[in-house]
Amino acid sequence: MTIELLKSIVESETSIPPSSQRLVYNQQLLGDDSKTLEQVGIGEGDMLGVHVTLRGGAPSVQGQARPTGIGGTSGASHSQQIQQRRQQQINPDPEMIRLHILGDPRVRDAVRQRNPELADVAHDPHRFREVLLTQQRLESQREAEKEARIAMLNADPFNPENQKEIEEIIRQNAVTENLHNAMEHHPESFGRVTMLYIPVEVNGHKLNAFVDSGAQVTIMSPDCATACNIMRLVDSRYGGIAKGVGTANILGRVHSAQIKIGDMFLPCSFTVMEGKHIDLLLGLDMLRRHQACIDLRRGALVIQDQAVPFLGEADIPKHLLEEFEDEPVIKGADGAEVGARTGAVTHQAGGSTPAPGPSSAANATASSSRPAAVHRPSPRWPEASIAKITELGFTREEATRALEAANGDLDGAIGFLI
């Protein structure tokens, strides 16, 4: 952090412009705004003095320095500091948030990923303030609607319809907790897995084959069959319509052709089918016939004790990857997007934080005569992380919810709140 950035933070706290600030450390004036705090020897918890020079010949602060801690709040009295902090908890200062985004690349990347609209206006203070306040207002409206709904449920908890809604809240909390556990213990399940390809040769023509043990037969596209010079061997009597996720036209079958896998030359039959962007798909008929083993630990297809390594992601041709990158997606109610073919999560749900349960249903019941209780998980994140977020002006509940949504990642939680 530079002296110039520190003056901007002091300005956001005190409304004193940087041109009127004179920072003093160990009775020495910090006049070079381009230097960093480390270069001038300022460390965590050190005390600085701020001399304020007023324009228009007004008397300046006579020899009295206004003490301020790095990242802290300056003020004349303890009561004013407490009041100012309470006000910041209610309305976080947009300029302080903006400077924090610009000063930390990790936070900036997290905000760009979670809130691109806000990240795009981070360099414009006025536009940033407008966008942030608009988003906060919409969030407050949603919270107010949620609280109003919860209050209505609390008014008549024995109503059967209210019980159904309470049950749904409990279910949503369980789903959210399951999501958090999955993100914490095996986050790789939310990523996209590279498909299995191996280099092969068919009738002397080199190509990359997609290994798919879920396909019943080995499939080849008409263009690939033409390039391999085996289109003339297609038996149209085996034509038809293939039905699955969609429909495709089967032109026929090549009963036998030579395929080279590794150093082995093997006989193989191909079903020529339209509608496939993949040139060659090795199905279960081919794999079972030659007793192939998909060894994921070795990252290879093993046939007759010979291992043929799968292609790495960088070795797979781009047009083959685009086949799965451009796949149709299924959208959920909260904005989650899941690939229709691969099942990969391409966009996580927006409402990942658990919905707060009604206050009257917060405790577990011991008898069946009482209405169902809504369990709200207790905070399980370090107090240091919560304290760093509350220093930015957010409440403790907001900090806890953000850490839950970000799976404990401090930078991600700050980006989620911003």
UniProtKB/Swiss-Prot annotation:
The active site is at D212. SUPFAM superfamilies: Acid proteases, UBA-like, Ubiquitin-like. Its EC number is 3.4.23.-. Residues 1-57 form the Ubiquitin-like domain. It comes from the Eukaryota. It is found in: Cytoplasm. PANTHER family: ASPARTYL PROTEASE DDI-RELATED, AT13091P. Binds ubiquitin and polyubiquitinated proteins. This is DNA damage-inducible protein 1. It comes from Emericella nidulans (strain FGSC A4 / ATCC 38163 / CBS 112.46 / NRRL 194 / M139).
